[in-house]
Regions:
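Cell wall/extracellular polymer interaction/catalysis modules
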Residues: 2-164, 172-184
Length: 184
């Protein structure tokens, strides 16, 4: 369900702000993106573990914009750079799609599923929850995986390399992050 379909209650906004302060995320995570992610997380009934992953596409690919939170322990577990789809933009992702062959990233809320060993190594299947926004993620083979072009040393050239639409992580972080967020 798109977050914009339901007005966010004032109590939920206050809870998001309190959580942001409690987790000491100022200067690390964009407050508006965090608040929106928490509101969506709280509406997802099917989740099976207290892990929230946020990709803040308002930031450039050269900055840490992939965040993993333990919502029970109220901790930031990981922060990393992450690649976006090659047709979503250069350093900033500005264009998004749910269409197969678009090579663009998709917005919205997902549930993580199981892992597999594929062409990009250890990978995590994503199930898009928002009709018309990201519900074709599986059909498009949009998965979380590691990639050499997503390593911070590549960012020194002005941007990370780009994927075919997948959120690609630095190779060294991919497996521990995937193991933390899978089956959620």
């Amino acid at each position: 369900v798109p977050a914009s379909d339901f007005p966010t209650p004032v109590s939920e906004l206050a809870a998001g702000e309190q959580l942001f302060e409690e987790m000491e995320l100022g200067g690390i995570v964009n407050f508006i993106a965090f608040r929106q992610a928490v509101a969506g997380y709280n509406r997802i009934k099917e989740k099976s573990k207290p892990i929230l992953t946020l990709i803040d596409f308002s930031k450039p690919s050269t900055e840490k914009r992939f965040f993993v939170f333990d919502m029970e322990k109220k901790q930031l577990l990981y922060s990393s750079v992450v690649s976006h789809g090659r047709n979503s933009g250069e350093n900033y992702a500005t264009s998004f799609s749910n269409q197969n062959g678009s090579y663009k990233s998709s917005l919205g809320f997902y549930l993580t599923e199981n892992t597999y060993q594929g062409g990009n190594g250890y990978s995590l299947i994503l199930n898009g929850l928002e009709k018309g926004i990201n519900d074709k993620a599986k059909e498009r083979s949009i998965v979380v995986h590691g990639a050499s072009y997503a390593n911070p040393t590549v960012a020194a050239s002005g941007r990370l390399g780009r994927s075919l639409g997948c959120p690609a992580l630095p190779t060294k972080l991919a497996k521990p992050i995937i193991n933390t967020i899978k089956d959620g």
